[in-house]
Each structure stands twice: as C-alpha cells, then as structure tokens.
Amino acid sequence: YSKIIFENNNMPTLLKYESISDRLIILEGWSKTYCMTGWRLGWSVWPKKIYDFANKLCVNDHSCPNSISQYAGIEALKGSQEEVIKISKEFEKRKDFIYEKLNSMERIKCFKPGGAFYAFPNISDTKMTGKKFAELALETHGVAVVPGTSFGDSVNDFIRLSYANSIENIEKAIYRLSKI
C-alpha cells in the first residue's frame, strides 16, 4: 500500500531506525499498487540473523512466480506511474466519502484513513463486538465487513470496511449498516 497514500503524506520507512533492524521484516508487492492481485509478486527485507531461515522458507513456499508475472512486474515498475496516481486519487475520493458517511452515523466513530483503501471505525457505541457486528451486517444486511479482532485483541470494538468499490456500492453498504 506504500503508493496509495493521501493528503500529501509521505510513506514512512522503518528502515531508518537502526535500533529495530535486527527484528524488522518488510514485505511489499505489486498487488495493490499495480492492481496485480493474484500475480504473486513481491519483495522483502529481512534481518541478517534470520535471512538463511527466511530464504529456506521462501524458496519452498513462494519463490517461483511465472515468467509472465515477472515481466509484467518489470513493466509496471518501468512504465508510467500515472495510472497509480490516478487510482490513488480515486481511492482518496472514496475515502473522503466513506469517512464522512461513517461519521454521520450516530454510533460509529472513524478516524480518517491516511492511505490504502480501508476504513477502521470504532463501533463500541453499538454495544456490540466487532465480531457480532460483522455477523449481523452479513446475515441480515448482506454487507461484508471484517471484525477488528482479525487484527488483534485490542481492537475488539472495531470493524474494517473496504472502499475498493464504487461510490454507489459504498453508499448502499453504509445505508444498510446504518440500519443495524
């Protein structure tokens, strides 16, 4: 998601913090930035002390993307980045829309996302856990959201919504969620 950032934010890099370099793993790929989900291309940075282990793990798990994917990835990097900028601007419009709509709901509070295409609102005022809210949203309103606990126990009263969809569909989903 490092290229899908909003409001002139710069993507910070943890590589500049030497004090954590011995336990820092960075993963990046082409999936989101270049709309190449499923092509299975990416890169990583590992600490020297676990590099050999990581290399053994990766070589047997995911080290052989096909040549078509590799050439497409090279072209994505070498080519014009105008489409990446265009897509990022579209996601920014959707972010502004979903942020405004979520915060207009009586029992939902949402911070403005700084990048990517997910909103992560706090739903604690609904008196439901994120898991219960997600189940209810899907079963009774046909809207799929992810409970916050998928990202750790400390966000039990949050949900994650994707805004990688049209404004029209986002509006329909928010309307349905407002009925919960």
Which role does the model predict for each range below?
Residues Y1-I180:
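PLP-dependent class I/II
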